[in-house]
Curated annotation (Swiss-Prot):
Species annotation: Ruegeria pomeroyi (strain ATCC 700808 / DSM 15171 / DSS-3)
Class in the EC hierarchy, top level: transferase
This protein's name: 3-methyl-2-oxobutanoate hydroxymethyltransferase
Domain of life: Bacteria
GO-annotated biological processes: pantothenate biosynthetic process
Amino acid sequence: MSATARKTAPNAQDIRARKGGVPLVSLTAYTTPMARLMDGHCDFVLVGDSVGMVLHGLNSTLGVTMEMMILHGQAVARGLDRAMLVIDMPFASYEEGPAQAFRNAARLMAETGAGAVKLEGGVEMAETIRFLVKRGIPVMAHIGLTPQSINTLGGYKVQGRDDQAQAVLADARAVADAGAFSVVLEKVPATLADRITAEVAIPTIGIGASAGCDGQILVVDDMLGFFTAFKPKFVKRYADLGPLAEAAIAEYAAEVRARSFPAAEHVFGDQAPAKGAKA
């Protein structure tokens, strides 16, 4: 479904209005077929920069480019009709300053039909968020564990424990005050996530946070069991499709080598079939 035909999808203000209501549901998507599967079940779908690790085999999100995000954003947009499309701003596309962020955010939205962008950072990104929002770019913030900053955070560690809690809380307040319509809380203690949810006026979207958040998001390949390089503690595997897919591929390979595929029902005869029969 093209972005211009998506008349029923919620917008940023609709998502913001869900604060304190029925929890928001979100997953990542990178392809049209997967977007179609989740369209009727998610309030918004995120084209995450996790695509670099999940589909492109990178060991972090740092190598993801604008071109990659646009390509996958366009693919996901074709599969959505009812869910809002949000797209990640990749590393080095917005940190230089508000003007750089606006150029790249506007390009992402214009070329993909996304209804909002997501960017990582708290207090240090408040000025940029405010700049974007004032110029018509809805922003979903992302604080706590910010994967684009793993080299300075020392890896994929829980953020906001002990004396770090006040800093994460300050980040949440800053992005809300700057005009973000929602904020992702990644890998923070549940008690801190609950406090942030209670104190900020915008919806909190948890990933490794708390069931008390205003919504939840997971990487779809994690929860379906396709991505097996590692499994974060916060992931629940609702299906284990990776082994099923591998078993199907192994069966196909065995049948090809045994010449049992294709069978008679998979090939075409010399004569045209009778009218109404399958070719």
